[in-house]
Amino acid sequence: MAQVQGIPAPSLVTTNGVPPSLIIRPFHQVGNVVSVRQFSNNAFNHHHGIQAEERFGLGDPDGDGFRSELTTADMTAVTLYQVTLNVPGQVIPSDPQVQQAIQAGQQLFTQVGCGSCHIPTLPLTANNNPGAPSQPGWIYTEPSPYNPTVGPNSPNLTPGPRNYPITAPALMVDLTSDSLPRPRLKVRGGVVWVPAYTDLKLHVMADGPTDPNAEPMDQNQPAGSPGFFAGNQTFITRKLWGLANAGPFGHAGKFTTMRDSINLGHNGEATASRLAFQALTSSQQDEVVEFLKSLQVLPSGTQCLVVNEHGHCLHEADE
């Protein structure tokens, strides 16, 4: 019998005899958002009080005097803007000592066990695209076939939503296309390897409900339910690509430095890796941090994924 681990609770529910979806929800620190479109719908409403028609309905559902605050076309444009942004890369300065530290830190990152959850690369294969079965996995489809369609907080984001009588075909975008902002990932041997440094799984990251890393609410449980107020210690593995531009650090942004995030934010299942990091010499710990600092968002238009501090390509294969 197989055991499923690291999947959020909503993806493990069996309803009326329908087996669990086992859908990975790669967004939000607790892994409860399926797609960029769902995330954008929620964020516009939660942070800005702007309501999308596809989630809240036509007209002026909140009665604030503003109609059609976000149309389906608006949400499609916002989503496509985000998913076609240039991917993060790596900056390796010209200083030989820093180069050596980054190389050593990358090896130590794996040695102490960080890479068991922060998996350096995950594949997009040519024969796995649920949104467009005839297309390879690097063809992005909008809307996502996994977008939620029911529930009080679930926008109806499938083609032809209930608020609109017109059914439009899914939009497809080749995420490796040179027409998109560079740098971009490329197909190598029929696979696009995504260096996101994650396993997209949920892990227990606290040592109990009193651990400062625990949260008082479990956002993977129904709002207002006993489970919701029971608290949460389980979080998705943070993507590390672009990490140097993403501070403050940790799942809740509690830590001002990467070192603090490692030392103070990795309990629970991450304890062994943290202890292994803390057992390194001070200079070795510095090397790990130097490697993490090299994972950066590159300026749009950068021609390759690995550059020096002047933006010059270091790996010819990435050009």
List where the protein language model places each region:
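Periplasmic c-type cytochrome electron-transfer domains
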Residues: 1-319
